[in-house]
Swiss-Prot record:
Protein name: UDP-3-O-acyl-N-acetylglucosamine deacetylase
Source species of the chain: Aeromonas salmonicida (strain A449)
Any one GO molecular function term: UDP-3-O-acyl-N-acetylglucosamine deacetylase activity
Keywords noted in UniProt: Hydrolase, Lipid A biosynthesis, Lipid biosynthesis, Lipid metabolism, Metal-binding, Zinc
Highest taxon above the source species: Bacteria
Organism phylogeny: Bacteria, Pseudomonadati, Pseudomonadota, Gammaproteobacteria, Aeromonadales
Pathway connected to this protein: Glycolipid biosynthesis; lipid IV(A) biosynthesis; lipid IV(A) from (3R)-3-hydroxytetradecanoyl-[acyl-carrier-protein] and UDP-N-acetyl-alpha-D-glucosamine: step 2/6
InterPro entries: Ribosomal_Su5_D2-typ_SF, UDP-acyl_GlcNac_deAcase, UDP-acyl_GlcNac_deAcase_C, UDP-acyl_N-AcGlcN_deAcase_N
Catalytic activity: a UDP-3-O-[(3R)-3-hydroxyacyl]-N-acetyl-alpha-D-glucosamine + H2O = a UDP-3-O-[(3R)-3-hydroxyacyl]-alpha-D-glucosamine + acetate
Length: 307
């Protein structure tokens, strides 16, 4: 049986919010079966819980944010969400003492490190997957995103299109099949990126206040400003993949199917996920409970403990 997963024990980290610039303390705590991913604002009295849910994503300006009916939010959850998806974590409490998840180094890798540090515990309940049965497509101008049936696991085909000297001659398309490819190896270290020409405006809107060369790839009109350059040749498109993985994990389940997109972003990713979930005949929940069942997606499995 492919089982649900949580952590063996709790772990804590401190960082800076990308947009708020505020110091944030974040704690991961194990959660019981069928809990899902739940964000907890511990700086509020009483503590406010915001479960990961596609319908609760109410702000997608430069990040993905969960916002409840009272306006309480947890922003910039996409990189952590991608790490949880990549590690196959089903149940977790994420405590934060601020309205934003810390940006760390701008990728999912520091979150992966924290999860690996304490280890994963398999739980005594079957892991549920969302399997795509019918194709779904959403558009916004020339941008589009779509799901297609793909029974062998989860496959991504994503293309970006930036008109900038750094992108010229660089591969802006990436195709990965996660039935064999590892999220940790292929995607997790790709950092968020931005342009110097946008920063002054963003900061005037109280955004990107915590952004720096330590947690983002920054480009001027001609080149990458980070002294160490890029972590891989296709870091830009792979970071967009990372964002999409995090955005699509707002359904709290891994997806069995193919995701294709052109110039997508947080808003379009969420729009696609909502369109899928609203069309009940387009998907089904499946489990793998037979003896010796194999997961259709390659998850990190070092140091697993069975609950």
């Amino acid at each position: 049986m492919i089982r649900q997963r949580t952590l063996k024990t709790s772990v804590q980290a401190t960082g800076v919010g990308l947009h708020s610039g505020r110091k944030v303390t974040m704690t991961f705590r194990p959660a019981p079966v069928n809990t899902g991913i739940v964000y907890l604002r511990t700086d509020l009295d009483p503590v406010v819980a915001l479960p990961a849910n596609a319908d609760q994503v109410r702000d997608t300006v430069l990040c993905t944010a969960l916002v409840n009916e009272a306006g309480v939010r947890v922003s910039t959850i996409e990189h952590l969400s991608a790490a949880l998806a990549g590690m196959g974590i089903d149940n977790l409490y994420v405590e934060v003492d601020a309205p934003e998840i810390p940006v760390m180094d701008g990728s999912a890798h520091p979150f992966i490190y924290l999860l690996q540090e304490v280890g994963i515990r398999e739980q005594n309940a079957a892991k549920q997957f969302v399997r795509i049965k019918q194709s779904i497509r959403v558009e916004d101008g020339d941008k589009w995103a779509e799901f297609h049936p793909y029974r062998n696991g989860f496959k991504m085909d994503l293309e970006i299109d930036f008109q900038h000297p750094v992108f010229e001659g660089r591969n802006q398309r990436c195709v990965l099949d996660f039935s064999g490819a590892s999220f940790v190896k292929e995607i997790s270290r790709a950092r968020t990126f931005g342009f110097m020409r946008d920063i002054e405006y963003l900061r005037s809107q109280n955004l990107a206040l915590g952004g720096s060369l330590e947690n983002a790839v920054v480009l001027d009109d001609y080149r990458v400003l980070n002294e160490d350059g890029l972590r891989c040749e296709d870091e830009f498109v792979k970071h967009k993949m990372l964002d999409a993985i995090g955005d699509l994990y707002m359904c709290n389940r891994s997806i069995i199917g193919e995701f294709r997109a052109y110039k997508t972003g947080h808003a379009l990713n969420n729009k696609l996920l909502r369109a899928l979930l609203a069309k009940q005949e387009a998907w089904e929940l499946v489990t793998f409970e037979g003896e010796g069942a194999k997961a259709p997606i390659a998850y990190y499995d070092n140091g697993l403990v069975l609950a």
